Amino acid sequence: MHISEKSCTFAAVFENNMSEDQKTHIIKTAGEMFFRLGIRSVSIDDICHELGMSKKTFYVYFESKDALIEQMLQANIDYIGGKMKSLSEQGDFRQLVKKFLKHQEAEKNDVRRVPQLVYDLKKYYPRQFADFQVKCFEMQKGYIKQYIELGVAQGLVRANLNVELAAVLFAKIHNDAIRDFEEIEMHNHNLHQLAHTAMDVFVRGILSEEGLKLYNEK
């Protein structure tokens, strides 16, 4: 029986897609467990039990727990990047800010679970955490710069603003807040409260008179 090259290619693509789906499922399940229980307290055995999967199958996709954590963090960056890219395609600065604030509010429950995850990453996986922070910083800086440039073009952000520096400032505030969450909690505040306040102060600081007038009507 002759099997065409096209059929073989389709089979290979299908098999690869199935493999990626399984890998994504493992990352998603493990990520949820890490957020809920902390990274240190969740073993590969726990993840496999939750998935109904053998350790042999797990190791087909990840050579170690460290490798899983690295890919989970990359998946998180991709998720945040997707959200920010979607906002950058709005074409309307006022709507962009509204949606940014809406996303922030919708994800407040997830933000409250971040401290345990960050604590474990800082203590037990410092290299992966440092790499994650660098990637997050660069990604956020790039998109925030796009947002601000859109606002300037539409007359809603101050034309004399140092756009590059403002984008760096926003990304640094966000990343430092996640890294130093213990200091925030010492003052009886949480990450969501800080993120909301920082966003409000930042936006008010960069807006033109017209932009501020519209922002106050939100």
Go through the PLM ranges and name each one.
Residues M1-N16, Q146-L150, Q154, E183, ...:
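C-terminal peripheral helix-coil segments that are non-catalytic and often amphipathic
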Residues M1-N17, E32, S41-S43, L51, ...:
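Short glycine/proline-centered loop/turn elements that form peptide/ligand docking sites
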Residues S19, I69, L73, I77, ...:
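Amphipathic, non-transmembrane alpha-helical scaffold segments
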Residues Q22-M33, I47, M72-N76, I80, ...:
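Generic hydrophobic, amphipathic alpha-helix propensity
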Residues H25, M33-Q71:
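Helix-turn-helix
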Residues A159-F181, L191-G205:
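Hydrophobic alpha-helical segments that form the core
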